[in-house]
């Protein structure tokens, strides 16, 4: 399955919430009718079944993190094997992806841009180049931008945007050095309250 390359705002409208797929610090609802689904009949909101509600939540989270269906299912299987709450485990596994950590540190304006930085070998973990977006970052790992990539205008622009956002407490970033430390795996309370991971657990438990 190929990645979605179409309009990003359309995906946010489909889910009825900002998926943070566009760069910038302003919420997108000022220019995008989030309450209306895309398409000719977008104004008509069908009443979702229990399954439909669970599916929409899974699609929403999958799109937020930019993960394909097969990858997402594998993350769920891994989360189910771990001790504790499966839904929380799932979100924590997604948060430890290298492309997501690069985004959280502000080196990429979006997760998609952060994924591209990783794929193009612009990112190092503990001094070694890593070009696998799904690479799992561990507590106390140091993530940095390669020296030859530090002049990229998009990275500088992303850092300027990130400076206006609320900084995640689980990462520590030195913007001047373009380097950050992943201090810990975030707790559930650190993450968006708009995600209902229990719906995803119910979906995959069927």
Swiss-Prot record:
GO biological processes: ribosomal small subunit biogenesis; translation
GO molecular function: rRNA binding; structural constituent of ribosome
InterPro entries, per the entry: Ribosomal_uS4, Ribosomal_uS4_bac-type, Ribosomal_uS4_CS, Ribosomal_uS4_N, S4_RNA-bd, S4_RNA-bd_sf
GO annotation, cellular component aspect: small ribosomal subunit
PROSITE patterns referenced in this protein's UniProt entry, alphabetically: RIBOSOMAL_S4, S4
Function of the protein: One of the primary rRNA binding proteins, it binds directly to 16S rRNA where it nucleates assembly of the body of the 30S subunit. With S5 and S12 plays an important role in translational accuracy.
Family: Belongs to the universal ribosomal protein uS4 family.
HAMAP family: Ribosomal_uS4_B
Protein name in UniProt: Small ribosomal subunit protein uS4
């Amino acid at each position: 399955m190929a990645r979605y390359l179409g309009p990003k705002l359309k995906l946010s409208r489909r889910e009825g919430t900002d998926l943070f797929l566009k760069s910038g610090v302003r919420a997108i609802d000022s220019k995008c009718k989030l309450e209306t689904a895309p398409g000719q009949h977008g104004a008509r909101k069908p009443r979702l079944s229990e399954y439909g509600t669970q599916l929409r939540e899974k699609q929403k989270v999958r799109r937020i993190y930019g993960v394909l269906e097969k990858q997402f299912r594998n993350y769920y299987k891994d989360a189910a094997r771990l001790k504790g709450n499966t839904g929380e485990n799932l979100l924590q596994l997604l948060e430890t992806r290298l492309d997501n950590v690069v985004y959280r540190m502000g080196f990429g304006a979006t997760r998609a841009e952060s994924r591209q930085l990783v794929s193009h070998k612009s990112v190092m973990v503990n001094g070694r180049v890593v070009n696998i977006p799904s690479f799992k970052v561990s507590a106390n790992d140091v993530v940095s931008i390669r020296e030859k990539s530090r002049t990229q205008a998009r990275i500088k622009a992303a850092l300027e945007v990130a400076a206006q956002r609320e900084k995640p407490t689980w990462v520590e970033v030195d913007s001047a050095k373009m380097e950050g430390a992943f201090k810990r795996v975030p707790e559930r309370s650190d993450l968006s309250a708009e995600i209902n991971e229990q719906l995803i657990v119910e979906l995959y438990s069927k």
